[in-house]
Amino acid sequence: MIKQRTLKNVIRATGVGLHTGEKVYLTLRPAAPNSGIKFRRVDLAEPVVIDARPDNVGDTTLSTTLVKGDVRISTVEHLLSAFAGLGIDNAYVDVSAPEVPIMDGSAGPFVFLIQSAGVQEQEAPKQFIRIKRPLQVEDGDKWARFEPHDGFKVTFTIDFDHPVFDKNSQTASIEFSSTSFVKEIARARTFGFMRDIEMLRKNRLALGGSMDNAIVVDKFRVLNEDGLRSGDEFVKHKILDAIGDLYLLGHSLIGSFTGYKSGHGLNNHLLCELLKARDAWEMVSFEDEGYAPISYMRTAPAGR
């Protein structure tokens, strides 16, 4: 039987919020079977728990933000992507601020934290959502689509009219496994344009952004001294984001996702439409690991 997974141990880290610039204390804790991923604001007089679910997404400006009443937890997608990549079904995520720390702008540090905590299999079957028919949402020339597929495949295309993007790949595809996620996707960093930074900061956004946690691009080039980690790092980060956004379903997917210039808002719209279309998906589990179309490593060394 493919079993649900949680963390073996509690693990802690400290970082800064990308948009708030605040110091954030992060704690990842094990959770019981069928708990799902639960985020907790522990800096409030009474801690507030927000389940990682599509209907709890209240804002998708520049990141995916979970909302309950007037309580917010932003930038959840990179950590959710790491949970998805290592097959973690159940965990508590405690944060001391309204944002998950940005770390280095990728999912790599979160993969390292999860591996350091250890992965614990639980005595409950892992539930997958299998896509049964195509489903697409659109916004102008942008679109996102699910299709049936025997595995989990993510394809993404970005389209930036810019010298740096013109000479690097703007389309990428990954056939998902823990190995491919850790090696190919996890270390792709978020990126931003110098021209946008002043406007963002006037709006109290990107206050914690720096070249330590993002790829920064001016009119002509990448400004980071160490350059890109790979020629397709920009589009690979969009795949990383999409994997995190899709994990708000609370289950690993069996199917293909294709995004064309899609972002957090359109990704979430697709999830909400999927959940409404009950003929488009089904829940499945696997008694025999050999029949499962997706493989998860027990441990996967974080790439350097």
Swiss-Prot record:
GO MF terms, alphabetically ordered: metal ion binding; UDP-3-O-acyl-N-acetylglucosamine deacetylase activity
Pfam families: LpxC
Database matches in InterPro entries: Ribosomal_Su5_D2-typ_SF, UDP-acyl_GlcNac_deAcase, UDP-acyl_GlcNac_deAcase_C, UDP-acyl_N-AcGlcN_deAcase_N
Source organism superkingdom: Bacteria
Keywords: Hydrolase, Lipid A biosynthesis, Lipid biosynthesis, Lipid metabolism, Metal-binding, Zinc
Entry EC no(s): 3.5.1.108
Catalytic activity: a UDP-3-O-[(3R)-3-hydroxyacyl]-N-acetyl-alpha-D-glucosamine + H2O = a UDP-3-O-[(3R)-3-hydroxyacyl]-alpha-D-glucosamine + acetate
Keyword flag Zinc: yes
SUPFAM superfamilies tied to this protein: Ribosomal protein S5 domain 2-like
HAMAP family reported in the protein's UniProt record: LpxC (MF_00388)
Function comment: Catalyzes the hydrolysis of UDP-3-O-myristoyl-N-acetylglucosamine to form UDP-3-O-myristoylglucosamine and acetate, the committed step in lipid A biosynthesis.
Family: Belongs to the LpxC family.
Protein name (Swiss-Prot/TrEMBL): UDP-3-O-acyl-N-acetylglucosamine deacetylase
Encoding gene per record: lpxC
